[in-house]
Amino acid sequence: MDDVDRGLLNEIQTGFPITGRPFHDLGVRLNCSEEEILTRVRRLKRKGIIRRIGGNFDSKRLGFATTLCAARVPEEKIRKFIKVVNRYPEVTHNYLRDNRYNIWFTFVARSSELICRYMKEIKEQTGVKEILNLPAVKIFKILVDFDLD
């Protein structure tokens, strides 16, 4: 990664232009052509440095329910459990952790009732009964910017 890549990553985290030609505008800011910016973004995506470019929305204000789930999954069931959980498009994150509760994942769905239904389905499909439903009571921070300079 060179200085232009780092500058590009800094810009697109929170300063992505909402215009007809955002990559052109990024190029102007970074003294590059639109095509060079597009080439760099594609390369950074291929390398897995950029996962996605898109908006972040306040799910609560849009009427969605969210929760953090912690599951106690026996080692021999981990693969199946992960596959079942990942089938749900409402799952936004899914992590293996070194803890008694070793799988942690988040749900964002139309209602908390729907989340409970999905959790019941996951329990039935995997045989894992110990899944904690930990909805947030208060959000203290949800944004992170990585300063790459």
Per-segment meaning from a language model:
Residues 1-149:
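A compositional/biophysical signature of low hydrophobicity enriched in polar/charged and small residues
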